[in-house]
UniProtKB/Swiss-Prot annotation:
GO terms for cellular component: cytosolic large ribosomal subunit. This protein is one of the early assembly proteins of the 50S ribosomal subunit, although it is not seen to bind rRNA by itself. It is important during the early stages of 50S assembly. This is Large ribosomal subunit protein uL13. It comes from the Bacteria. Gene3D superfamilies: Ribosomal protein L13. CDD domains: Ribosomal_L13. It comes from Neisseria gonorrhoeae (strain ATCC 700825 / FA 1090).
Amino acid sequence: MKTFSAKPHEVKREWFVIDAQDKVLGRVATEVASRLRGKHKPEYTPHVDTGDYIIVINADKLRVTGAKFEDKKYFRHSGFPGGIYERTFREMQDQFPGRALEQAVKGMLPKGPLGYAMIKKLKVYAGAEHAHAAQQPKVLELK
C-alpha cells in the first residue's frame, strides 16, 4: 500500500468563522494555526497547503491571562542603529486590533513559501462584521 500524498489541485477548502470575543489569545491562535495548516483533515500532507480559510471576528475583544495585558511586549526594528520600537499588548490592541492575533498565528506557521500562502487564508476583523458572507462560512466553536 502506498502512502497517500495530497495534490494541491485536489484540496477542498472550507470557510470557517471564529468569534474571538472573551477568548484567550493563545488558545485561539493555536486552533487557527492548526486549521490553516490542515492538520484536522485526514488528507493532511506536510508539504502541501491543505488548510481552510479562517475568518476571526471580534479580535479587539481578545483577552490574555495574568498580567500580560500590560507586560507583554511586541518589538519591531527600523533597521537603523537605535531604531527599536516596543508596544505593550494594550497599546497594540488599541492601535491595531487583531494584529496581535495575526503575529501569534504567523509565528506558529512554517517559515517559507508554504507558510506565506497559509497566512493569506487568515482574515481578521476587529468588529462583529466581516465581508465574506458570500462564502457561507461555518461557525467554529472553540472550547
